[in-house]
Each structure stands twice: as structure tokens, then as C-alpha cells.
């Protein structure tokens, strides 16, 4: 490797809004503040909500369905 052309790779601290502190390495060189992490993200905590689109699907099918003739 060439000397003097690579960025400094230093240890930084990433702090989440929930209080979780993660130590990692980066070339950024300054500490990070995170909005969500693995401890508080809804997908990982099991608090994820499923958006109900049933009414919209029914309305679409009603609007664009072929009328049945009996």
C-alpha cells in the first residue's frame, strides 16, 4: 500500500436516541448520533404495525372489475 494516501481509521462512538452506545471504527473521525438502532427499531423489537390496505384494494377491484351479467 502507498503511504500517506489513506484516510485515518479511528474508533468512534455512535449514540442512539434510546441511549444505546455503539463503538465502531470509521474514517469520518467524529462521533455519530443515530435516530434508531437495532435495540429500538420497530422491525427488530416486534412492534412493527402492518398497514391495512384492504379497503383500497376492494375499491380498486370494484372500480375496475368487469361487471357480471347473469
Curated annotation (Swiss-Prot):
Zn(2+) binds at residues 16, 18, 37, 40. PROSITE patterns: RIBOSOMAL_L31. GO terms for biological process: translation. It holds the Pfam family Ribosomal_L31. Keywords: Metal-binding, Ribonucleoprotein, Ribosomal protein, RNA-binding, rRNA-binding, Zinc. One of its GO terms (molecular function) is rRNA binding. GO terms for cellular component: ribonucleoprotein complex; ribosome. Gene3D superfamilies: Ribosomal protein L31. Its cofactor is Zn(2+). InterPro entries: Ribosomal_bL28/bL31-like_sf, Ribosomal_bL31, Ribosomal_bL31_A, Ribosomal_bL31_sf. It comes from the Bacteria. Binds 1 zinc ion per subunit. NCBIfam families: L31 (TIGR00105), PRK00019.1 (NF000612), PRK00528.1 (NF001809). HAMAP family: Ribosomal_bL31_1. Part of the 50S ribosomal subunit. PANTHER family: 50S RIBOSOMAL PROTEIN L31, CHLOROPLASTIC (PTHR33280), LARGE RIBOSOMAL SUBUNIT PROTEIN BL31A (PTHR33280:SF6). Binds the 23S rRNA. Belongs to the bacterial ribosomal protein bL31 family. Type A subfamily. This is Large ribosomal subunit protein bL31.
